[in-house]
Amino acid sequence: MEAMTPEEYLMQVKNIDLRICSLEGELHDAENENDTEYVEELRQTIKQDIEKHKELKFRIRNEIQQLPDNRLSTLLIEYYVKGKSWEMVAAALGLKDEKNVRLSLREKALKLFAAHYPKYFLYYSDLHILT
């Protein structure tokens, strides 16, 4: 695995969602142009991406659920896995200040994730986790 930050690692789920949406738009355009060969290529690519997305989402969700802090793991799942906005994440945590969630709690959650999986993020392994 290529060296990534915890944020980049978790963003893989959101990024593949964006790719699938883009390909679906391209598929729609190709269908309108009756380009059957290209339509079939796009369908196969989308199918492969969806399979990859399911596996990645399942793995990352399981890794997050192993974290000892339920509040921080909920934050990571709501934002990175479920793709919710920071406002929705704050509401899921029972908080009103989305800015605090986005800036402060997110940083704590990412540090906790990095500390829990040092094999992925060796240069984060010596970070002090704020409590």
Residue ranges and their predicted role:
Residues Y80, A92-L93:
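Short N-terminal micro-motifs specific to bacterial/archaeal maturation
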Residues L67-K84:
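Short amphipathic alpha helix immediately N-terminal
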Residues L75-L76, V89-A91:
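Hydrophobic positions on the alpha-helical face of helix-turn-helix-like DNA-binding modules
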Residues D69, L95-E98:
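Alpha-helix boundary/capping and short turn/kink residues
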Residues M1-Q66, E87, G94, E107, ...:
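N-terminal interaction/assembly modules
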Residues L75, E98-L112:
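Major-groove recognition helix of helix-turn-helix-like DNA-binding domains
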